[in-house]
Every structure is written in C-alpha cells, then in structure tokens.
C-alpha cells in the first residue's frame, strides 16, 4: 500500500501558501484589471496607437502570468486530491504516482511565483541593458570580458530573454574591450540587477608562455530600459556624437558598415554605443535610448544611500567592488556577497547562474 498522508499534507500546505500569495499579489485587483486590459485590446481603435497597444499587451502578459498561475495552483490542488482519492479507492499505484508527480509540479510553480514576489522594484519588470567592460591586464582581461559576455548571452538564451548584442569592441589580440547586451522579456532587470559589479578571474593564462597564474577583472553594469514618458533632461550641448565603422566580435550579430554611433554625455562621462543596425539613424536612436536609461539608473543609484556611488561602481575595476570570484585552476566559483559556491565551473561559464542570482535576490542585495 502507498503512503497517502505525505501527499495530502503537501497539498494542504500548497493551498495555504497559495492563499497567502493570493493576498500578497492582489489577485482580485489583478484579475479585474486583466479583464479591463483584455477588453481594451479587443477594441479595433486601440491599434491606431501602436505604442499604447504594445504597452497594454505587455501589461496583459504580466497580469496573466500571476492570475493564471494562481488559478492553476488552486484548481490543481483540488485535482490532485481527487486523484489521490481515486488511487486509494482503486488501490491503483500508478494513479497514486501520477498524483505525486502532479503535486511536485504544483510545488515548483508555487515556488517560482513566491520567488517573483522579490521583484517589487519600480523597474524590475522592465527589459534591461548590460554593459561589460574589461579591466586592466591587456589580452588576458579582454579574453575574460569575452568569456563573461558569452556567459550572459547563454544565460539570456536559456531564459528566453532574446539577448541582443547592441555593441561590441574587439580586444587588441583576443577577446573584447567592451560590449552591451539588451535583454528583452518579463522581469529581465529584476533577474539581472544584482549582477552589477566586478567579476574576478584567476587562472593559468593561455597567453603566458610560462603558464603562470594571472588575476583579471571585468565589470558588468545593469540598467533598465525606461518608458518614453519618463522625463530625463539631456542638453544636446552636453553630448559628443561620434560615427565609426563597426568592428565587433559579434559575427553576424554586428553590422560592419560605417554607421556605428557612440554618444558621450560629457558632464558624467557616460558613454553608450550601438552598431547592430545598417541605419546610422536607428543606431543613434538606440544609443540615445540607452543613454537615457543609463543616466536614469545612475541617478537612482546616487539617490539610494544603500548602494555604492556611481564612481565606485564604474571606475573601481579591482578588488573593492568584486561580486564573484572565478578561480578556474582550483575549479571554484564563489559569490563574495552571499557565500554561494560551486565547483562546476564550466556549467557556470556556460550560463548556469541561477543559484547565484537567486541567492543574491533572496538576501535583498
């Protein structure tokens, strides 16, 4: 005979946690708003304003993910309880194992939804950009920056965030000097915001004929894409705009014609670049959008006394602002903020970052 009580206890706990989430996440208000948004999207005239229609579509998707998940959890718990009853009545072990599997799947959905409660920041639901910059150290540091770029591209692809290489500047011999990735999808900024900081690599360098250990640094800076209606005053006189030929390491992702655009905001020395379109005009628009988003995020960071000052975040590519250490010849990667550690270095470099990101979010970084 099979053990029924553990499954029934799990279902009871799942139902209680679902009810708590129903309150925390304002289920009733979201369901009502979902009906309003869906009704508006059914009106033909809404498509006369493509930007508004797009914003409503995005809002509907976010609302559906909460409302539908809570509905699935509520109905699912009842369905599994019925499966357990049928299994007991018919002494059917196969049906009972099906109930156990369903209960485990429901628990995973619930844990995912509970985790998303941590995405309560103003821009957590937004798309985002990540700037990657190699530190001092020449070819070794530039190769490390390229490895970090690949790691985040892999992470983004695995999570359905459609990573797009906006800009990429080749290293002198190998690797890259800098790159910008755009991540598009729900809660992209929420997931990646704690990845801002310095990544430290220790390894026997393939570029050193003596095979000596080298330490290299690379910084990542994450900032959300902001809505067009957010007012960011940028004086055109404060901008320097340069046009150049794209020369990135992005292969087919990066355009090679002389239409790449670099914009420098002189008062803050903030730089954005775009080279992924054949149109100089489109690249300039994209670079301006990035600049606006970057200046906004930097202003938010300045206003938040709990965060590091902009100068520390941007200029100290060294020991002080490290977030993670990658010691490859010792097969050890450790997050210096949360203490999370793994010896599966290749998996992490292939984009398996969730254990680190989840721990940093849970610790409130």
UniProtKB/Swiss-Prot annotation:
Name this protein carries in UniProt: Peptide chain release factor 2
SUPFAM superfamilies associated with the record: Release factor
Modified residues (N5-methylglutamine): 252
Taxonomy, superkingdom: Bacteria
Annotated Gene3D superfamilies: 3.30.160.20, 3.30.70.1660, Release factor
Main function: Peptide chain release factor 2 directs the termination of translation in response to the peptide chain termination codons UGA and UAA.
Annotated Pfam families: PCRF, RF-1
Location, primary (coarse class): cytoplasm
Recorded coiled-coil stretches: none
Keywords, alphabetical: Cytoplasm, Methylation, Protein biosynthesis
Record InterPro entries: PCRF, Pep_chain_release_fac_I, Pep_chain_release_fac_I_sf, PrfB
PTM remark: Methylated by PrmC. Methylation increases the termination efficiency of RF2.
Entry similarity comment: Belongs to the prokaryotic/mitochondrial release factor family.
Keyword Oxidoreductase: no
One GO MF term: translation release factor activity, codon specific
Signal peptide range in chain numbering: none
GO cellular component terms, semicolon-separated: cytoplasm
Subcellular location: Cytoplasm
């Amino acid at each position: 005979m099979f053990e029924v009580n553990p499954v029934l206890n799990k279902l009871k706990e799942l139902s209680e946690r679902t009810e708590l989430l129903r309150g925390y996440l304002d289920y009733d208000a979201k369901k009502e708003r979902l009906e309003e948004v869906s009704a508006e999207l059914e009106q033909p005239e809404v498509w006369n304003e493509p930007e508004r229609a797009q914003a409503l579509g995005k809002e509907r998707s976010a609302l559906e993910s909460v409302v539908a998940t809570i509905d699935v959890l509520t109905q699912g718990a009842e369905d599994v309880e019925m499966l357990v009853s049928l299994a007991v009545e018919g002494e059917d072990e196969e049906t009972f194992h099906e109930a156990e599997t369903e209960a485990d799947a429901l628990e995973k959905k619930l844990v995912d939804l509970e985790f998303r409660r941590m995405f309560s920041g103003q821009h957590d639901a937004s798309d985002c950009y990540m700037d990657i910059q190699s530190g001092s150290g020449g070819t070794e540091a530039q190769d490390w920056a390229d490895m970090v770029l690949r790691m985040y591209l892999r992470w983004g692809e695995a999570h359905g965030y459609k990573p797009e290489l906006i800009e990429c500047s080749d290293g002198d011999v190998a690797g890259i000097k800098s790159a910008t990735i755009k991540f598009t999808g729900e809660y992209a900024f929420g997931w990646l915001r704690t990845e801002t900081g310095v990544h430290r690599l220790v390894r026997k360098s393939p570029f050193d004929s003596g095979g000596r250990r080298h330490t290299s640094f690379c910084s990542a800076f994450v900032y959300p894409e902001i809505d067009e209606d957010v007012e960011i005053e940028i004086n055109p006189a404060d901008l320097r705009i340069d046009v150049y030929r794209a020369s990135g390491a992005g292969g087919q992702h990066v355009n090679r014609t002389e239409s790449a655009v670099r914009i420098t905001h002189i008062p803050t020395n903030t730089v954005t670049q775009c080279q992924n379109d054949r149109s100089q005009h489109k690249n300039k628009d994209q670079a301006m959008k990035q600049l606006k988003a970057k200046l906004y995020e930097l202003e938010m960071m300045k206003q938040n006394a709990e965060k590091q000052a902009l100068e520390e975040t941007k200029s100290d590519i060294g020991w002080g602002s490290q977030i993670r250490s990658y010691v490859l010849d010792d097969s050890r990667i450790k997050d210096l903020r949360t203490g999370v550690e793994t010896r599966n270095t290749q998996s992490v470099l292939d984009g398996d970052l969730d254990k680190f990101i989840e721990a940093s979010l849970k610790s409130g970084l």
